Amino acid sequence: MGNLLKVLTCTDLEQGPNFFLDFENAQPTESEKEIYNQVNVVLKDAEGILEDLQSYRGAGHEIREAIQHPADEKLQEKAWGAVVPLVGKLKKFYEFSQRLEAALRGLLGALTSTPYSPTQHLEREQALAKQFAEILHFTLRFDELKMTNPAIQNDFSYYRRTLSRMRINNVPAEGENEVNNELANRMSLFYAEATPMLKTLSDATTKFVSENKNLPIENTTDCLSTMASVCRVMLETPEYRSRFTNEETVSFCLRVMVGVIILYDHVHPVGAFAKTSKIDMKGCIKVLKDQPPNSVEGLLNALRYTTKHLNDETTSKQIRSMLQ
């Protein structure tokens, strides 16, 4: 596995840059196992979280009925009874974001530590790199689902309004134990974000950088830009792409590439779109545009609307027009 990742700085594809990150089969080495096992405990719950979010239908009908007939106690009880278990789910999603944040920080600690360069880390610790990719993949999928489900914020707003009304009237409320006021405030801020999981990762990465002052910020941002390069080259090099045994790996790679670009753009002082950026943005956008349009529109939108520096004056007109 030692030679799987090489020549990351080589951009001349005719020379055949030789690196491949095994997203499908990477297994932890002895030195990776401790962090790997900690992160794995979190990641094994990720698919269940996505399934719960995908099947989240909301209590819109019950809430509308209750609001339209404020004097009808039965309708009020019905709406409250529908919302309380949903808020339990929203609490579970929020708590998972906190666990994901801790997992990410563990991975960043391992993948940015001295004396190795980001390239060497990704080459030596492929299983941790794969977990980092899985966190990014989960994050984009979660935020895509959340963004298209207005019921989440409607349900939570109704829950908070009803709870405060019950408190004023001294009505005991089942469900209050589920989410106390301080937690409700934090959940409100989380769900008010267009892309709450990405914001969690971005804040966690920024915090990691500020708490590790002895570690140059480049160790972290270079880890991100290197991961973006790996994904781009694996996708645009037929020799590497043909090694994927599962078609899903292509969409996994695309999502990870976009996730890592967005994270880099939020964490790096000048962002991903500046001329000095270590990410080949034109190359990455071209790779996206070379896919079937309906499979990447969501990812292109993520670059358009959730990055931080796209509309800066320093961003080249060519990159902006590629994303129009």
Swiss-Prot record:
Expressed in pancreatic ducts (at protein level). Disruption phenotype: Myeloid-specific conditional knockout mice have a reduced survival following Salmonella systemic infection. Upon infection, they show increased levels of several serum pro-inflammatory cytokines and chemokines produced by activated neutrophils and monocytes. Its main location: membrane. The gene is Cyrib. It comes from Mus musculus (Mouse). Interacts with RAC1 (GTP-bound form preferentially). A lipid is attached at G2 (N-myristoyl glycine). It is found in: Membrane; Mitochondrion. Signal peptide: none annotated. One of its GO terms (molecular function) is MHC class Ib protein binding, via antigen binding groove. This is CYFIP-related Rac1 interactor B. GO terms for biological process: cellular response to molecule of bacterial origin; negative regulation of actin filament polymerization; negative regulation of small GTPase mediated signal transduction; positive regulation of memory T cell activation; positive regulation of T cell activation; positive regulation of T cell mediated cytotoxicity; positive regulation of type II interferon production; regulation of cell migration. It comes from the Eukaryota. The lineage of its organism: Eukaryota, Metazoa, Chordata, Craniata, Vertebrata.
